[in-house]
Amino acid sequence: MAMPESGEVADERRGTATADPAVAVERSEADGGFKGGGQQQRSRFEAGSMPGMFGEKGEPSLLGASEPGAGISWEKGEQLRRYAVGLMSGTSVDGIDAAAVEIIGVPGGDGGVSVRLLAFENKPYPADVRREIFELFDPARATVDRVGAMNVRLGRLYADAALSVIGKAGLSPADVSVVGSHGQTIYHAPEAGFTVQIGEGAVIAARTGIPCVSDFRPADLAVGGQGAPLVPFTEYLLYREPDRTLLLQNIGGIGNVTVIPAGCGPEDVYAFDTGPGNMLIDGVASLVTGGALAMDAGGALAARGSANETLLGELRQDAYYALPVPKSTGRERFGADYLERIVRRGRELGLSDADLAATVTRLTAWSIGDAYDRFIAARYAADLMIVGGGGSYNPVLMRDLAAEMAARGVTVATQEAVGGSSDAKEAIAFALLADYAMARQPANLPAATGAARPAVLGRSRTEHSTRLGLQARQALLERGYSRVRAQ
């Protein structure tokens, strides 16, 4: 069982701890985090060097293009353009990530689509909401009345987040074609064929006046998939390259990797959960401090300790790591009970709080390297691992991960180093998935989820049945009509 991809809060993770200078991790200078290990290394991320990630003139432009190097610009003729909002809340339950984007092109069309991020915000959950969501992770406490009430309350919070980011982008709700809301996962049971995300889409549609697509995962489960991961579909659209094999590693509550082979088609892309991400790191910080810390911000606690090889050796024996792909995991496996066992064993070994934090941080990095050895290296020799999610702001974790992957000949970079956004990446993905849903285009990757066939994802709710659908707007555009706003 798994709690799928997480949209992590990163602001508090912009590290105060000092990383080992011997291990370089790429992060853009403007981000204020990791910088490259010399000019030769940095040259791989100069403007224009990531096809599809930068415009033809070298300036950062569209975040991705369906065809490598084919960034769509304002001057290249009339294209179908629209605005969408993506909402994401992940397994760390920190809050709501909201992204407003511009999408250009036709979903499923020969020309593909590209996406430009207009605005991003994170709206932290109120303390009582976060506390109750954690209680709902326990099936015995997730009674129908409690789940129903939180479903509506989250719908209101998501709607408010959507309206806020729309305003930040300089748009009005009337400009936006669709809101894509992942919702908050409270239970995910792929072996039983079901998943539960809450945050009512009908409430979002009613409060914003914008069509809303939500409940993305059940359609994949219904055709035999895991219902996760879903983000690899959008990663394929936005990141693939003709000559380099990329690994897109997200480190949210759970870690997950997408393998994008050089020159691949959608059938070649696969993805899976690598194991715990920030879940154990933050869990240890909270447990050993009696809740005084909600997370190990900046890896500060782990930086004061040393990883214990005895405990690491025991933790590496968990059966999940050897399970075949596709696979997914989550709090049901690496949650509170597992965490308490780790802390008890650590105390038996005489470990300090900092040593415990350092050990589970090293475990997360090891699990990513181990997954590469078991499930990727024999098929593809990766050139670059691009890391996103809240874990990318933990310098101790990134130091450990860079060391793991350097031993395997793989360079590690952050989303910011290649022109992306660690914070916004998954919210962007659900905006694009909603756009595909409105066009009734499949948006899962069977090779990633294990589904028997492609499926149209999500359920749509709308307050305005007269609002033009994507296909109708494209038909009008082809007949000479244009709703493209003047810039």
Say what each PLM segment does.
Residues 81-83, 190-195, 202, 210-293, ...:
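Phosphate-binding/catalytic loop of phosphoryl-transfer enzymes
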Residues 80-116, 247-262:
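Gly/Thr-rich phosphate-binding beta-strand-loop-beta motif of the actin/hexokinase/Hsp70
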Residues 157-165, 353-381:
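Phosphate/ATP-binding catalytic cores across multiple sugar-kinase/actin-like superfamilies
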Residues 186, 382-404:
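Glycine-rich phosphate-binding loops at beta-strand->alpha-helix junctions
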Residues 140-199:
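Short beta-strand-loop/turn "lid" adjacent to the catalytic site in phosphate-handling enzymes
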Residues 95-125, 264-365, 369, 453-486:
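Conserved ATP-utilizing enzyme core subdomain
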Residues 102-165:
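Glycine-rich nucleotide/cofactor/substrate-binding loop typically near the N-terminus or early
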Residues 93, 358, 362, 413-466, ...:
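Glycine-rich phosphate-binding/hydrolytic loop that grips phosphoryl groups
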